[in-house]
Amino acid sequence: MIWNLNKLNLTVLNLIWCDIMTQISDAKKGILTEEMKHVAKIENVSEDFILKSVAKGTIVIPSNVNRDIEASGIGAGLRTKVNATVGTSTDIVDFDEEVKKAQIAIDHGADCLMELSIGGDLDVIRRRVLDMSPLPVGSVPVYQASIESIREHGSVVDMTEDDLFNAIEKQAKDGIDFMAIHSSINIETLTRLKRQGRVTGLVSRGGSFMSGWIVENEQENPLYSNFDYVLELAKEHDVVLSLANGMRAGSIADSTDRAQIQELIILGELIDRSREAGVQCMIEGPGHIPINEIPTNVMIQKKMCSNAPFYMLGPIVCDVAPGYDHIVSAIGAASSAKAGADFICYVTPAEHLALPDPDDVKEGVIATKIGAYAGDLATGIIDGSQDLAMAEARKRLDWEAQYECAMFPEAAHAKRDQRPPEEEDTCTMCGNFCAVKIVNEWLDKSDSDLIK
């Protein structure tokens, strides 16, 4: 069966949808859900703020009706969230390793996970991650549809519309909380890309799958032409749509170009349709982008997409540091959070080089958490009380209090223990010449008439 719901009577479609309750449809009716209450509590904001923001679509709460998780809010006025990706490749298929990586990401403060496997039994690994994760879990359904098409038919371009929609439906039923949907890779955006040209072309895996399908089949992307059916499937399970940026630049040489902006215009239109249908939605943003263009990108996205939550991938702010791209991304994360981005996908030291191992995942989460924190500190989302407590503990040379104030206390403790000082109130960097100790002993205690 080929789905072509654009031909359905929209009145009938609206009747189908109207009985299904989602976070956004509840909020529009003034209904405060338990998930909204929880988000308000952990974010230290009013329930009324959350209710109104979810109703407007400026905050989303990924929480599939088929899973019981700790709800997390993403959007304006909330702490910037960090996503960690896990998943097999065609070269390395180790389900236990992926579950271990997911647990490491959770332990080090990731707010959400995405399961992006393309090797092995994709249903099994997805369900294992869903079963173990107390966090929202996202996916990219076109991966499964494409990989299974290759296995069954020999090619991505032989994928059917049913393959695409069946993958979305299956993953929604499994409990996936948010999905990257590549609806904006269409004839219009591909035409714009071809006319313009690029250094690195398309680097989105899902975008490359769909662009190949469109060109070979000489048909419009079903995820665009039948977007109403995507909305119906998402609404049934209250899945947040993360409208994917298949046209994102793969190098800073291609950043903020016409193809990217063309896609953003289409995404803005899809946001309006999603909200009208009662489906929560956010927008994915650039991957490779220089620092000076980050505020511009956030501003354009917020205006074109009616202030929908913005999900930045990294971003990578220079292209010449493979092996250290988690540091590059932390810089991008801080700049993005400061500019108003709402959700950051981590980058690991293995980016552009290999499938991340558990240590890579740990380093990626830590770096991105620090970047997001720094951005939130600059905007005032974080009030700085933890930083003040750390400053006061350092002034007192109170090492235990410093560990308690640290984002990652085990790392701080381990580093000091590796090279212990002769005197407990100092460290081996300065020893007896510690500036804080000197000031504490002489300047602060001085009763000199000269310095009052």
Question: Which residues does each predicted region cover?
Answer:
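Catalytic or ion-coupling anion/metal-binding cores of large enzyme and transporter domains
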Residues: 191-218, 249-255, 355-452
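Alpha/beta enzyme core
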Residues: 22, 26, 34, 38-310, ...
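C-terminal catalytic subdomain
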Residues: 320-329, 334-381
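Conserved phosphate/anionic-ligand binding catalytic regions in large, soluble enzymes, centered on
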Residues: 176-179, 183-185, 323-347, 425-438
